[in-house]
């Protein structure tokens, strides 16, 4: 090997200045995830308690629902602090409404009215559907009788025509 290559290799392994010990490779420092530990210690100071047996948490924000299934819920009522941890799923309110309608109380009545109005705006022909169904039902009704006319005479007239062809 020539001298230039050796000097280049020597410079890459030296971690300090002139006169320091050479290392074969640089030490890689691991970055520890202290964020979670710091958060847990802060929550412990606030005094949160774990709330068991919560199957689902829904956070409503405009027309979007952030849904947590089987989350870990911690709360400190005195500090008005709620911690919901888990994997969130963002869904539209219209998609999740049939599942959560039983959970909604009377305080959400205004929101339900707004949703109903939005559905009617999205489907403008929705109000006309009962009228069209009613017209189709009229076809199944028995026609009114006409005085002097029977069903037997048209049937006898059609029978010879069918036999001729």
Swiss-Prot record:
Gene3D superfamilies per the UniProt record, alphabetical: Nascent polypeptide-associated complex domain
Keyword Cell wall biogenesis/degradation attributed: no
Instruction: State where composition is biased (Low complexity).
Output: 144-165
This protein's UniProt keywords: Transcription, Transcription regulation
Instruction: Tell me the ranges covered by the NAC-A/B domain, including all copies.
Output: 33-97
Q: Where is the composition biased (Acidic residues)?
A: 134-143
Please state which protein family the record places this protein in: Belongs to the NAC-beta family.
What name goes with this protein? Nascent polypeptide-associated complex subunit beta
């Amino acid at each position: 090997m020539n001298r230039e290559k050796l000097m280049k290799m020597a410079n890459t392994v030296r971690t300090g200045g002139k006169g320091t010990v050479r290392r074969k490779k640089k030490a890689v420092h691991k970055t520890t995830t202290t964020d979670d530990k710091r958060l847990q210690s802060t929550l412990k100071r606030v005094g949160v308690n774990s709330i068991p047996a919560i199957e689902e948490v829904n956070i409503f924000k405009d027309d979007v629902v952030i849904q947590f299934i089987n989350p870990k819920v911690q709360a400190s009522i005195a500090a008005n602090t709620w911690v919901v941890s888990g994997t969130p799923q963002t869904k539209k309110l219209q998609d999740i409404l049939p599942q959560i309608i039983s959970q909604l109380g009377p305080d959400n009545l205004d929101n339900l009215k707004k949703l109903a109005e939005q559905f009617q705006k999205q489907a403008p022909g929705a109000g006309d559907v009962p009228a069209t169904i009613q017209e189709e039902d009229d076809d199944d009704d028995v026609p009114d009788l006409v005085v002097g006319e029977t069903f037997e005479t048209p049937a006898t007239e059609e029978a010879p025509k069918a036999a001729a062809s």
